[in-house]
């Protein structure tokens, strides 16, 4: 039973970290609120996530980020900042999720969380210019909304169905990897076209 609980916590942690790669603030807010409502139990070291000041700050930043990422002029700036925020969020979520049910060393948990969230965030950051260039910026709000929705679904699955959340993260990383490859090819083709133009 203890092994099953530990595996479940680790799989759920991957789900939360993947969600953080898409939206760094949403899973932090959701986990803090879930702990506050007694739906989940975080280790004593992560009780600050469910404190009133933390929930207020996370909620405000989440709303600002949610709006800002829909604006083409701001999304690139937010993605640049997210290069540091997303891995940090993933590290916190992974260690918080595994703190009670797993014997995974905190340092290892933090590294796994940071890598998972960072990889997802890096892929969407590389792919976003491709979306902007092929849709003249019109597709950015739609893609951003899809990312937020996926982050929410992943967060819920991570807390309720960890195994499914882990599978979704794997599929997501493959899909983002393919989109990143397409974005790089598009950027190279555009660069060659620009060089060849008189």
State where each predicted segment sits.
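Helix-coil boundary and interhelical linker segments in multi-pass alpha-helical membrane proteins
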Residues: 1-8, 34-52, 93-109, 158-166
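The first (N-terminal) embedded transmembrane alpha-helix
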Residues: 9-11, 17-34
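Helical membrane-embedded segments and adjacent short helical loop/helix-boundary regions
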Residues: 20-25, 47-58, 82-86
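A cytosolic-side transmembrane-helix exit/cap motif
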Residues: 45-53, 98-106, 125-136, 184-197
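C-terminal ends of transmembrane helices
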Residues: 62-75, 125-132
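Cytoplasmic-side transmembrane-helix entry/capping segments in multi-pass membrane proteins
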Residues: 75-88, 107-110, 135, 141
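Small-residue-rich segments of transmembrane alpha-helices in multi-pass membrane proteins
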Residues: 83-95, 139-153
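Mid-bilayer segments of alpha-helical transmembrane spans in multi-pass integral membrane proteins
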Residues: 88-97, 106-127, 149
């Amino acid at each position: 039973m203890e092994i099953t609980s530990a595996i479940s916590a680790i799989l759920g942690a991957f789900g939360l970290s993947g969600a953080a790669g898409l939206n760094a603030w949403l899973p932090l807010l959701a986990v803090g609120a879930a702990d506050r409502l007694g739906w989940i139990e975080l280790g004593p070291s992560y009780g600050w996530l469910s404190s009133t000041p933390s929930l207020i700050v996370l909620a405000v930043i989440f709303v600002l980020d949610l709006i800002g990422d829909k604006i083409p002029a701001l999304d690139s700036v937010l993605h640049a900042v997210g290069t540091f925020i997303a891995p940090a969020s993933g590290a916190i979520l992974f260690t918080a999720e595994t703190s009670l049910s797993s014997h995974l060393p905190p340092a290892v948990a933090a590294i796994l969380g940071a890598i998972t969230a960072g990889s997802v965030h890096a892929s969407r950051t590389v792919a976003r210019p491709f979306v902007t260039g092929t849709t003249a910026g019109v597709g950015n709000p739609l893609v951003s909304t899809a990312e937020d929705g996926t982050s929410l679904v992943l967060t819920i699955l991570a807390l309720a169905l960890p195994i499914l959340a882990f599978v979704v993260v794997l599929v997501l990383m493959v899909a983002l990897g393919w989109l990143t490859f397409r974005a790089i090819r598009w950027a190279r083709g555009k660069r060659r076209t620009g060089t060849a133009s008189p």
